[in-house]
């Protein structure tokens, strides 16, 4: 069981020589407001409507409730999950296999999966597993995250054809690819 921290605990945490507030792994669901330049350990959990100052850093496997807001230049480790309606300032970076609820919004120049200046869209309840599939457009091109798969759009299409050729799953995945390209192109600046 993770230690549950309160706002009072947050006041006792130390800052390192560069001014970063060191926050250990734990349950932060009782806290709504966090200052700038916090560093959180892995597996931290946060409640709904949390607000984080700019330049916060989160380790892997952190989870965030609905409508949380993050300042610019925040960094997130792999496999973090975000509730619906969360908003991120510009230049935020997201690790691999992060998941996002509906209606999340992203500032300019955010990066997902290590891609440069990426934007994304998701199609839910698709494929044999009926899971969410993420499509990204970045300076490096188009990419797809579907379960354990992460690769280029063309690699994904090849994998879909080899795995689901001639089935409804191939048809729906390829339709989702076409939709993603059209929508991402319309949003690309």
What is each of the regions a protein language model found here?
Residues 1-54, 60, 66:
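Extended, small-residue-rich solenoid/repeat segments and analogous flexible loops
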Residues 1-29, 128-189:
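Terminal amphipathic alpha-helical/low-complexity segments used for targeting or macromolecular assembly
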Residues 12, 19, 30, 45, ...:
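Low-complexity, compositionally biased segments
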Residues 36-113:
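A detector of tandem-repeat and repeat-rich interaction/domain scaffolds
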Residues 85, 94, 100-154, 158-159:
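Glycine-rich hexapeptide-repeat left-handed beta-helix
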């Amino acid at each position: 069981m993770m230690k549950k921290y309160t706002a009072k605990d947050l006041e006792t945490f130390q800052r390192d020589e560069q001014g970063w507030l060191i926050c250990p792994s734990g349950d932060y669901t009782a806290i709504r407001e966090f200052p700038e330049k916090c560093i959180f350990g892995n597996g931290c959990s946060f409640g709904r409507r949390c607000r984080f100052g700019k330049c916060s850093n989160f380790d892997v496997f952190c989870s965030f409730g609905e409508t949380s807001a993050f300042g610019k230049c925040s960094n997130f480790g792999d496999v973090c999950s975000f509730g619906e309606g969360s908003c991120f300032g510009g230049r935020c970076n997201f690790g691999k296999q992060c998941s996002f609820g509906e209606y999340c919004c992203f500032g300019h120049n955010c990066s997902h999966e290590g891609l440069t200046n990426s934007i994304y869209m998701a199609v839910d309840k698709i494929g044999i597993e009926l899971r969410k599939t993420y499509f990204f457009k970045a300076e490096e091109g188009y990419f797809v995250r579907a379960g354990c798969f992460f690769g280029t759009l063309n690699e994904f299409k090849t994998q879909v054809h080899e795995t689901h050729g001639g089935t409804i799953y191939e048809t729906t995945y390829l339709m989702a690819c076409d939709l993603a390209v059209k929508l991402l192109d319309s949003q690309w600046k």
